[in-house]
């Protein structure tokens, strides 16, 4: 919860309650500003964490085949409406020189990047670019599929619709067969 101004968030939530016509001193919402401030500190904790730290500890393994962690659940907040979007991320890379990281580090990187006011496209690209920068693999593919509450509960109101984004780096950009293989494994 470092660098989060809880008091400012509480004041803002109190003002929102007043602005929509509610009484912020009403019993049911009396502690809402405090709860929302605590929740925002948690769901935006990625603002104060560098996802690349998870790729500092590298293991040397005689492995230059694909590594894929799929169905990594995540939750994020749309930066346009500050409502949630959530889904699954699939992260694959082909190590170079046997440089591998613990599998949990891929999931931690996804979580950290998602815990910011965010766009799905940016989550996808940031995770891929961080892996490329820190591990220097032969290639990376990140696919993210999510449902956006800004499309479900407001606006077009299309519950169940999914948005899919991908980031393709390194060998996967030019090698169509390798790209097709990893995409089929992610399904």
Swiss-Prot record:
It catalyses: GTP + H2O = 7,8-dihydroneopterin 3'-triphosphate + formate + H(+). Zn(2+) binds at residues 78, 81, 150. Its EC number is 3.5.4.16. Pathway: Cofactor biosynthesis; 7,8-dihydroneopterin triphosphate biosynthesis; 7,8-dihydroneopterin triphosphate from GTP: step 1/1. Keywords: GTP-binding, Hydrolase, Metal-binding, Nucleotide-binding, One-carbon metabolism, Zinc. GO terms for cellular component: cytoplasm. GO terms for biological process: one-carbon metabolic process; tetrahydrobiopterin biosynthetic process; tetrahydrofolate biosynthetic process. It is an enzyme of class 3 (hydrolase). InterPro entries: GTP-CH-I_C/QueF, GTP-CH-I_N, GTP_CycHdrlase_I, GTP_CycHdrlase_I_CS, GTP_CycHdrlase_I_dom. GO terms for molecular function: GTP binding; GTP cyclohydrolase I activity; zinc ion binding. It comes from the Bacteria. Homomer. Belongs to the GTP cyclohydrolase I family. HAMAP family: FolE. This is GTP cyclohydrolase 1. The gene is folE.
């Amino acid at each position: 919860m470092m660098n989060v101004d809880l008091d400012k968030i509480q004041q803002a939530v109190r003002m929102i309650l007043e602005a929509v016509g509610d009484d912020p001193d009403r019993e049911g919402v009396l502690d809402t500003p405090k709860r929302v401030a605590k929740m925002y500190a948690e769901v935006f904790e990625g603002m104060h964490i560098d996802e690349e730290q998870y790729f500092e500890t590298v293991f040397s393994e005689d492995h230059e085949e694909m590594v894929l962690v799929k169905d990594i659940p995540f939750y994020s907040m749309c930066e346009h409406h500050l409502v949630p979007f959530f889904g699954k991320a699939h992260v694959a890379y082909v190590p170079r020189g046997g440089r591998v990281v613990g599998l949990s580090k891929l999931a931690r990187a996804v979580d950290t990047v998602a815990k910011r006011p965010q766009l799905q496209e940016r989550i996808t690209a940031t995770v891929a670019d961080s892996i490329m920068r820190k591990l220097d693999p032969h290639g990376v593919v990140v696919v993210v599929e999510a449902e956006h509450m800004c499309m479900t509960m407001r606006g077009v109101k299309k519950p169940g619709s999914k948005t899919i984004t991908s980031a393709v780096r390194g060998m996967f950009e030019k090698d169509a067969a390798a790209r097709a293989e990893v995409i089929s494994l992610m399904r």
